[in-house]
Curated annotation (Swiss-Prot):
Transmembrane segments: none annotated. This is Small ribosomal subunit protein uS11A. One of its GO terms (molecular function) is structural constituent of ribosome. InterPro entries: Ribosomal_uS11 (IPR001971), Ribosomal_uS11_CS (IPR018102), Ribosomal_uS11_sf (IPR036967). Pfam families: Ribosomal_S11. PROSITE patterns: RIBOSOMAL_S11. It comes from the Eukaryota.
Length: 152
């Protein structure tokens, strides 16, 4: 004899949102860490504490050729991807931390920095603070190239 189905309790599935619980029109901030070297561009969005990664996309993930990883076009595609993911999780505004290689290497950001920042701004994300977090040494180790420098 089969067990009766009358006693079975129907469980309701609760939808779980990964994003914060906010009202419409409320501004929710994340932090976009843009690392632009001359070989690649990383666009990495975290929560305000910086511990929880929301999305991370690089220029190399968006283009096929190795030489195009650091290009402004690849950085733009990466930033658009990240912005789309942020919107789906409920993040509406970003603080931006821009970083170059730094240390005893170049202190200027690569070619993808400007276009990544621009793409984030154009994708209807509000921009909070823009900060340069390139590591600058107070007294560096000796730079490569020797006494007479790099000869071309």
């Amino acid at each position: 004899m089969a067990p009766s189905r009358k006693n079975k309790v129907v469980k309701e599935e609760v939808q779980v949102s990964l994003g914060p619980q906010v009202r419409d029109g409320e501004v929710v901030f994340g932090v976009a860490h843009i690392y632009a070297s001359f070989n690649d561009t990383f666009v990495h969005v975290t929560d305000l504490s910086g511990k929880e990664t929301i999305s991370r996309v690089t220029g190399g993930m968006k283009v096929k050729a190795d030489r195009d990883e650091a290009s402004p076009y690849a950085a733009m595609l990466a930033a658009q991807d990240v912005a789309e993911k942020c919107k789906s999780l409920g993040i509406t505004a970003l603080h931006i931390k821009l970083r170059a290689t730094g240390g005893n290497r170049t202190k200027t950001p690569g070619p993808g920095a400007q276009s990544a920042l621009r793409a984030l701004a154009r994708s209807s994300m509000k921009i909070g603070r823009i900060e340069d977090v390139t590591p600058i040494p107070s007294d560096s180790t000796r730079r490569k190239g020797g006494r007479r420098g790099r000869r071309l």
